[in-house]
Amino acid sequence: MGCRDILLTFSVALLLISLFQIWLFREGRQVPELSDDQLGKDRNTLMTSKNKNKNEDVQRLFQRYFKGRSFGLNNTNSRFEDSNRRIPSSPDRLHN
């Protein structure tokens, strides 16, 4: 019966933890959305500026991560720069 008691204790503890998390996230603060009246005539301007900022952030992160390199599908440049390649100096694989 020792194994059954441990399993029962574990399942009750798991249930209590999940109920606590549900209670905690239910009490969380919700950010209200802006209505049409609050946005007024500038709704389209606000939406396009958000999309523009998002596109600029994506471009900035892309340039930062790939360091300005372009990875187009029709790109004829080699993917590896010649300066980063290592040419084996001997036929022995152990010493390359």
UniProtKB/Swiss-Prot annotation:
**GO terms assigned for molecular function:** receptor serine/threonine kinase binding
What GO CC terms are in its UniProt record? apoplast
* Region described as Disordered: spans on this chain: 71-96
Q: Which UniProt keywords apply?
A: Developmental protein, Differentiation, Glycoprotein, Hydroxylation, Secreted, Signal
Glycosylated positions are 74, 91
- Sites of Hydroxyproline modification: 88, 91
**Cleaved signal peptide residues:** 1-28
Q: In this UniProt entry, which cysteines form S-S bonds?
A: none
- Alphabetical GO biological process terms: cell-cell signaling involved in cell fate commitment
Q: Does the keyword Protein biosynthesis apply?
A: no
- Give the similarity note: Belongs to the CLV3/ESR signal peptide family.
* Protein name, as recorded: CLAVATA3/ESR (CLE)-related protein 43
> What organism does the record attribute this protein to?
Arabidopsis thaliana
Q: What is the lineage of its organism?
A: Eukaryota, Viridiplantae, Streptophyta, Embryophyta, Tracheophyta
